[in-house]
Amino acid sequence: MLKIIIPTIMLFPVTWCSSSPMIWINTTLHSLLISLAGLLFLNQFNDSNNNFSLTFFSDSLSSPLVVLTMWLLPLMIMASQHHLKKEPWTLKKLYISMLIFLQMFLIMTFTATELILFYILFEATLIPTLIIITRWGNQTERLNAGLYFLFYTLIGSLPLLVALIHIQNYLGSLNMLTMSFCFQELSNSWSSNLLWMACIMAFMVKMPLYGLHLWLPKAHVEAPIAGSMVLAAVLLKLGGYGMMRITMILNPMTKYMAYPFLMLCLWGMIMTSSICLRQTDLKSLIAYSSVSHMALVIVAILIQTPWSFMGATILMIAHGLTSSMLFCLANSNYERIHSRTMLLARGIQTILPLMATWWLLASLTNLALPPSINLIGELFVTMASFSWSNITIILMGLNMLITALYSLYMLTTTQRGKLTYHSHNLNPSFTRENTLMSMHMLPLLLFTLNPKIILGPTY
């Protein structure tokens, strides 16, 4: 793991020692080199002793998420250049440093062996994200969004800390690799129910579960582009990753306790998809679509079958790339039109035809068009939930239908129609933006050719 963490730490001197005009080039190239070196993680064997140490370990669940985190940093730096154009150089360097801190914490969170270390790093990711949202957001509402984000995450995570201390006293160890062997099965008592709730609640807030999702649209809408990208692509996946790890030691309680959460997810999935159909704000629409997709992942994890785990892992990776790309596209519209309202961007296809192609590709992957990995993930989850209960097929089908509707609604509203009078003299799409979109799209297309490398630990 140090071969990734040490080069990431070396990004700090690269950032602060670069001459002002060279910051963007140096940091982008260095972070891209790290992510290309990290691609080797995808081609690994679970039983190799190179992957395990007392502090860090990587297996087929954490590796794709680590690679996704590393792949995203150069993309975030590329996307932020226009947003920071008027900032002084010191603040630009500080902004990039926050992104590097975030990448470092995320990599260590996904590979932590001890659950307490995982918890500390899980909470540490909050600090750079909060600074990015509250310092570099566009409107004054960013402070309110930051407050929501902070308190939802902290209050949701506190019971987890208490539960982990209790398990530490009971077992004497919180090592993820050994816990599943030495942890006795929980009895069906009130104390076990509370322990299960405490362990799972932090991740439910992070995912977020429908009902605990109010911080997400606020944070997404007010965050700058890099904040939105990392929130949608990686921070939501922390919840899914944590749930997959912690449910291994909570059996057989998950079977009994999961029902209300499954109902809430299946209901919330339909509700948030329906909310998307009524949105006028582009970033808000993409944020609500994230809640809908993550509800599918929660359903998959709580069903606890190998197929559902595979579906959850694929969906997390696919959604990370797709939603990040959608936020980049929304940002490129915002840079030209200076509004997030979709109707004001209508007819933009006639001026920016290549950007319209990226919009089409992003919308199609979002609605899970065959043969995209989004579809493979949704099919796995649908089949797993159908074997759990036949009725879920109706809800899953309805969700797929509404997802297709709002994805096409988003595409037609922003791209088609009569051009508005203020849109005639827009900047053309830059090479930087097209490179950015292609680097989101390329992994999605390549994973389609070989999805087994992101099928997770149950494959």
Swiss-Prot record:
It is a multi-pass membrane protein. It is an enzyme of class 7 (translocase). Its EC number is 7.1.1.2. The chain crosses the membrane at residues 22-42, 60-80, 90-110, 113-133, 145-165, 194-214, 224-244, 257-277, 284-303, 308-330, 351-371, 391-411. Core subunit of the mitochondrial membrane respiratory chain NADH dehydrogenase (Complex I) which catalyzes electron transfer from NADH through the respiratory chain, using ubiquinone as an electron acceptor. Essential for the catalytic activity and assembly of complex I. The keyword Membrane applies. This is NADH-ubiquinone oxidoreductase chain 4.
